Amino acid sequence: MTTATDTPIAHTDPINAQILAISEDRIQGFVRDPFGEIARQSGVDPEVVMERIRAMLRGGTIRRVRQTLMATNLAEGALVAWQFPNEKLDEAFDFMFQQDPFSGHVVIRSTDAATPGSSYRLWTTVKVPQGYSIEKHCAFLAQLTGADHFRVMPAKRIFALGVGHVRRKGMEPGSKSEELAQVKDTAKVELSDLEWQVLTALKRELEPEEVSRDLWSKRASEAGVPLEQFLEVAENLNRRGVVGRFSTFLEHVKPLQTGERVTRFNALFHWAVPPGREIEAGQQVGRFHILTHCYWREGGPEFRNVNIMAVAHGTEKEMVLAHKRAIDEHLASIGMPVSYTNVFWGGRSEIKPSEISPFAYQEWCASRGVDPQSMRE
């Protein structure tokens, strides 16, 4: 057995790449033995899989390992674009990342030229528990940070969601699925107290020493329920569509300990298609393998009424734009009218899982001197 210090941690190491090609986004839903399943699909011995994931997590190549949730079905969520005076931008970024547990991805974006919406530099994902108002939450954040304006854009439908940076490396522009992208609804699911108990233990990030085949028995103890009941509740939640995937998330923004970067460019693509054809367009755009996210969101007049948004990453800007051109050409070839399109490039960026527990929200409001009841819809 190799020691922790000489276990390779580079995402480009052949065995690590084999593991990551599966572990980033191929373990869908809840499985009883996620590391065994990664081993089965990757063809790498389970002990080696766990040793490598532990080493990459300790070394910072992997920034977190966790069971994700389909939070769009559990909480009120949106992509929010914020307009700030330039001198307040970095301070607002720090606040959203460090002091708002309900903001997830926080990124400063820019466009190659002055375009509609290019003055909205700060983009965040925000989620609040069911029953609370995302507009009120954002208005409160705007007050705390001195924002001039903000635009809340909830996802109406989801067409693609799966990161897989290693799997996408070297992908040719135009690579797409034969079939249309599946449409995921964002209807809300209500949970019992027991289900929240299980879900809270289920979704917590793994420490390196928790990377083991009996992962869920420890989480069942944490939730205060017998293992079999924990597994049954988790599988029921999975059937109800509220469990996402078991995933290793790479550090894809900052340079790694090895000096490499997983990706350099993060692009948010916008398209405006005719009202009434959003699902048709989303199912076409969502076919493209390069996209890590694709949604129907309403950009409103601030963004020239764009309604399809997608995210792609890459190590070269020209290659990211080549992928965008391939999507544009495909939309033109099928006769899908696009009245406007744009690219917002990501700069400074931080990501953390958003808190979605109603109990945590009530505590946060109280800590800020706000009556939680006043934040309800």
Which residues make up each language-model segment?
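A compositional/biophysical signature of low hydrophobicity enriched in polar/charged and small residues
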Residues: 1-377
